[in-house]
């Protein structure tokens, strides 16, 4: 077994016959841990309840703290959360009181590993063409809140207004 620049020790898995470096395994786990909060925030788009302004503010704050760009957040929604929760958009009596965290973490982790598969991506984009309208309003509100938070607010000096 040859290592690149002898930096990382390769690990061999007999079951899968794949080589993974220690660094890759840890970076994937860190990436998944960072995404869990985002998965739970995005999951509220799929509940059968109406989100209030407070909910959008909370979700936008979580998205801002996550460090992901809006484009990355939309990709996380499309390829990691949407495949898991799209059925809740289709059912007449969908889940409305919340989604089990453990189940959501496991299911989204599986789709995280499948997200680069071309067939998987094609299938998800097909369903998304039909169902995106059900999530579009959420993303529009979140984007506007995130833009307003990042745009610097210029304070108005009342003395300047009075003197003119």
What are these regions (language model features)?
Residues 2-4, 18:
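Basic polycationic patches enriched in arginine
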Residues 3, 55, 99-100:
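Poly-acidic low-complexity segments
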Residues 11-33, 60-164:
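Small-residue-enriched hydrophobic alpha-helices in membranes
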Residues 28-62:
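Short terminal alpha-helical segments
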């Amino acid at each position: 077994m040859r290592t690149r620049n002898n930096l990382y020790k390769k690990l061999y898995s007999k079951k899968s016959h794949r080589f993974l470096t220690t660094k890759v395994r840890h970076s994937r786990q860190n990436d998944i841990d960072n995404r869990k909060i985002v998965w739970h925030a995005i999951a509220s788009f799929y509940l059968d309840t109406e989100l209030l302004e407070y909910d959008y503010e909370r979700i936008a704050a979580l998205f801002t703290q996550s460090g992901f760009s809006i484009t990355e957040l939309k990709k996380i929604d499309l390829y990691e959360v949407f495949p898991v929760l799209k059925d809740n958009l289709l059912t007449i009596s969908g889940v409305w009181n919340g989604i089990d965290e453990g189940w959501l973490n496991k299911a989204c982790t599986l789709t995280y590993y499948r997200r680069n598969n071309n067939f998987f991506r094609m299938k998800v984009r097909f369903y998304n063409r039909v169902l995106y309208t059900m999530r579009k309003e959420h993303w529009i509100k979140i984007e506007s809140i995130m833009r307003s938070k990042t745009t610097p607010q210029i304070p108005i000096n009342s003395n300047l207004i009075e003197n003119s």
